Amino acid sequence: MAKSKDEIKEEIAKAIINQVSKTDLSRRRALSTLAKGGIIAGVLAAFGAGFGSGYVTAPKGSSSSGVAPPQPGFMYGQVPEHPTWKIVFINHVTTNPFFVPTQYGIQDACLLLDCNYQWTGSETSDTTTMVNDMEAAISQGANGIAVSVISPNAFDKPTQDALNAGIPVFAYNAYIPTDDPSYSQYHNPPYLGYIGQSLYASGQLFGQRILNLVPSGSRVALFIATPGTANIQPRIDGIQSVIEGHYTIDVVATGALVSDEQSAIESYFNSHPDVKGMFAVDAGSTQGVGNVLREHGIKTVSNGGTIAAGGYDLLPATIQNIVDGYLDFTIDQQPYLQGFLPTLAIYLYLISDTLVYPLNIDTGSKFITNSNIQPYLLASRYEGSSTAYKPTSTTSSSSSSG
């Protein structure tokens, strides 16, 4: 029997609250930030207070609780009546598999909040295409816009134009990190908040991990899909700020398309037999590093091998490469929340008549290794490996040979 829309909403609600309130420190901090920003209250109001069958009435107000009594006929869990708002997400690599869970997050938030969305932008980090799509969204009367700010200055005017037209704009996944000396002379567009990873700081944490894995004086390769774009360049800047002077460092551009990245890594590997560390700052390059080592049958140092390797994000091949010993680690930045939370932030801004902002949420830099990979072996909508709302076990969770 097919589930009703309300049953699906309740299922999403339970999963989202669980997703942001798991017990590790970064997620507890995220939950605290959400609560301070008014987001959890909005989630609970939209999801339903009681997570039981059907809706439950709102609690009666009292001087101790500070909760006002509900209006007659009000049912907790109902979204306040509003037009069907359209939210446009402008992305820099629209077909990249990293953003599959991001799109699921947008879909789920729109289902819960009775909104529509459009996913558009560039497939190859082309800023002009992104700006054109943003201007089109403004002219076509979008109710809210979320944009990955991958380049200084380019998004200033369209962001201000949107705000002038009464359209809220939030940044997600990428912003201009002024804590990175390479970007300190720039500024961010006048968006209302940013939801995503703290990019430069994440790179510095990554650099410390390299120091622990690779002997000083060795050759280290840093792979980056698109040098100079603000979604990943700050990571490599952060890494280099920590490891410079310790290694011979090769920075290798791999290209915006996942299909090209592994070829670039293979070419580098074949011409540098002395390399002792291979690290990537984007999802496709990370997958490529693990795949190249797998093809050559070379395990990483934490698995008894000779080369250290790691990167970012949780593509299915990356997860399996960690399990099988061809990557030492990867970093989870929770792409699902980078879709869900901007949608919710725009909704709260609109429903509150501009009261709920600014909102800045760091979605984290959680190191995933063989010792804590187990939860990620489940097929999960929240990591992009399934469409199901409840994570389920898979048949590929055990180590394979090679």
UniProtKB/Swiss-Prot annotation:
What are the protein's UniProt keywords?
Answer: Cell membrane, Membrane, Sugar transport, Transmembrane, Transmembrane helix, Transport
Topology relative to the lipid bilayer, per the entry, is: Single-pass membrane protein
Q: Name one GO cellular component term.
A: plasma membrane
Q: Where in the cell is it found?
A: Cell membrane
Quote the subunit structure annotation.
The complex is composed of two ATP-binding proteins (XylG), two transmembrane proteins (XylH) and a solute-binding protein (XylF).
Could you say what a knockout of this gene produces?
Answer: Deletion of the gene results in a growth defect on D-xylose and L-arabinose.
Q: What does this protein do?
A: Part of the ABC transporter complex XylFGH involved in the uptake of xylose and arabinose.
Q: Which domain of life is it from?
A: Archaea
Name the UniProt record assigns to this protein:
Xylose/arabinose-binding protein XylF
Q: Which gene encodes it?
A: xylF
> Any transmembrane segments, and where?
38-58
The similarity annotation says: Belongs to the bacterial solute-binding protein 2 family.
Q: What induces it?
A: Up-regulated in the presence of D-xylose, L-arabinose and D-arabinose.
Q: Which GO terms describe its molecular function?
A: carbohydrate binding
Principal localisation: membrane
